[in-house]
Amino acid sequence: QDGKSSFQKEGGGVR
């Protein structure tokens, strides 16, 4: 799951 990794990297936990 690369999408989740990139999402958390941006700083968006619950968006």
UniProtKB/Swiss-Prot annotation:
User: What cellular-component terms does GO give this entry?
Assistant: extracellular region
Q: Which terms under GO biological process does the entry name?
A: blood coagulation
Per the record, residues carrying Pyrrolidone carboxylic acid are Q1
Maturation and modification: Conversion of fibrinogen to fibrin is triggered by thrombin, which cleaves fibrinopeptides A and B from alpha and beta chains, and thus exposes the N-terminal polymerization sites responsible for the formation of the soft clot. The soft clot is converted into the hard clot by factor XIIIA which catalyzes the epsilon-(gamma-glutamyl)lysine cross-linking between gamma chains (stronger) and between alpha chains (weaker) of different monomers.
Q: Where in the cell is it found?
A: Secreted
Keywords recorded for this protein, A-Z: Blood coagulation, Coiled coil, Disulfide bond, Hemostasis, Pyrrolidone carboxylic acid, Secreted
Does the record carry Ribonucleoprotein as a key word?
no
Role this protein plays:
Cleaved by the protease thrombin to yield monomers which, together with fibrinogen beta (FGB) and fibrinogen gamma (FGG), polymerize to form an insoluble fibrin matrix. Fibrin has a major function in hemostasis as one of the primary components of blood clots.
Entry domain remark = A long coiled coil structure formed by 3 polypeptide chains connects the central nodule to the C-terminal domains (distal nodules). The long C-terminal ends of the alpha chains fold back, contributing a fourth strand to the coiled coil structure.
Quaternary structure annotation from Swiss-Prot or TrEMBL: Heterohexamer; disulfide linked. Contains 2 sets of 3 non-identical chains (alpha, beta and gamma). The 2 heterotrimers are in head to head conformation with the N-termini in a small central domain.
What is the protein's name according to its record?
Fibrinogen alpha chain
